[in-house]
Amino acid sequence: MKFSTVFTAIFALGTAVSAQQVVTPASDPLALELSQRNLDKLYELQERDLFSIVEGLFSSINYTSILDSIDYESIAGWTNNLLVENNNIEYLDNILNFLGDTDLVPFAVSYLLSNNETRNIVGEVVIEALPLIKDIDPTPIFVALKNSGLAYVLVADLIKNPNTVPFVKQVVVDLLDEGSFGLGDLFGGSSEATTTAVAIDSLATINTNIDLTVAAAPTTKAQSIGSIDTASLAVLFSEARTANGNGATKVANTVAVTAQVTAQVTNVGTTAKATKAVATGEINYSGITGPAYESLPPTQFGSVPTSINYSALSQISGALRKREYNDAVEAALRDIQKREEGIDDVEIALRKMKRDNIEDLLTTIFASVARSNLLNTTIQYLVTDQRFESTVVELLQGVFENIGSTLTGILDTDWSALQPLVSSLLNSGLLTDFISRAFNDDELKAVLWNDITSIFKRDMAFRDEIVKRSNGTITSLPVSDFITGVATETSALDGADGTLSSLDVTAFINTVSHSFITSNASSSAVITIQSDNAGSSYGPGFYSTIFAVFGLFAMMI
């Protein structure tokens, strides 16, 4: 037993050593390569399985039910109470001011719009989110914008910023230089249309005859709807009387029947009479006789006059309507209906209270944004950022290059879907509040007036400043514009290749003024400048200013 145990152990050890020597890189590299390949496939399978598991996990989650189960109104009310109590809103103000000081928000906006990949992602997100807007009630948002004044502050800060008009003008100039107004697609473009002609019958050849088969005569007769022989009606009445045992003489097929109906309205009722039915036979249709609620046998049809008393019918129906039923079931139903009306009133009140929670929270947040410097710094960053300006030009180029399809898409849009949005906007009072604030803002009116005058009267101001100079100084004209206008005429003043790099600005202005006063010649530099700027200039600068004005008004809207 002991010898067999030792022998078995030695044999197992030798087998293990021999197996280790077989699987070595030197002895079997192919086996190692296969093993590495199998490991790669195993990793791929494991990665694929992991993705499938994650995908299945996300697909099994019902996001709609989760979102619907969230009580947003209660959460909004709790959050608003947390912000307004103990003046905790100061923390939100500090956070927004910090974001404004770091320029993080405008940098993110500029980067997302200037980068092609991120811009495409933003566009896809916006397109996917548009259908969800119709399921959201925008009234709390509009009311919060009005109560907080955020909408007006945004537009007013944009207009009051001194860099807004130069930004708009530069965008328009870049568009004009690039020739991006692709109006050819709208006015001069070519289009092809294929029309398939459908063969239809002319109205003159449409058969309007409808055949009616009258089975009262000895033989079947087909007659047109436009030429029906009224004698067939007499035949029908005659056959009806024959079927009920009255053997009166049948009316001939060629009988001419004349019917006259008169209606008489009195306080008692209305009498309907059918008179003057004369034929070659014995039948005389005088009228219908009998009470209104009593049926008349066919054998008595047309025998004696009949008076239909509609007043009696109205009295009966009125009595039935006024009758009260002592029904326990109906009383219980009325009681339940009253309770449901009370429950509906409570639900409406709760719904309004919950909607007020959302409005209060949005108003609190929007008011904090309006108080902070976030809007002002964001606008200042964007209107002075060259990358953002290039992005705006690029986006407008794409719009104008496809203006034909853009207008077609606008015309084909179902604008009726925006009716709830427009109604919410009008009912919120945001527009009236915005207009009222604008009319009462003296600073805004002054800025608008200065912007308009600076655009349309730039050349006049330039000329007036030169003419009105009295002490060699310029009061309101930018010195850079003045130097740019006269630099080409003053090469002799500096003596260094016609530039003003080394000439003092005050000395330069005094020199020009002294030259104008002493020489009084028509060839002076100032007079040359005046003659060049006299009249109205309709060059590219004029058109660019016009487009800049339109762009400014568009941004205001």
Curated annotation (Swiss-Prot):
Keywords: Cell membrane, Coiled coil, Glycoprotein, GPI-anchor, Lipoprotein, Membrane, Signal, Virulence. Its main location: membrane. One of its GO terms (cellular component) is side of membrane. Residues 320-355 form a coiled coil. It comes from the Eukaryota. Substrate for cleavage by KEX2 in vitro. A lipid is attached at residue 533 (GPI-anchor amidated asparagine). It is found in: Cell membrane. Glycans are attached at residues 62, 116, 284, 309, 376, 471, 520. Predicted GPI-anchored protein which may have a role during host infection. This is Predicted GPI-anchored protein 17.
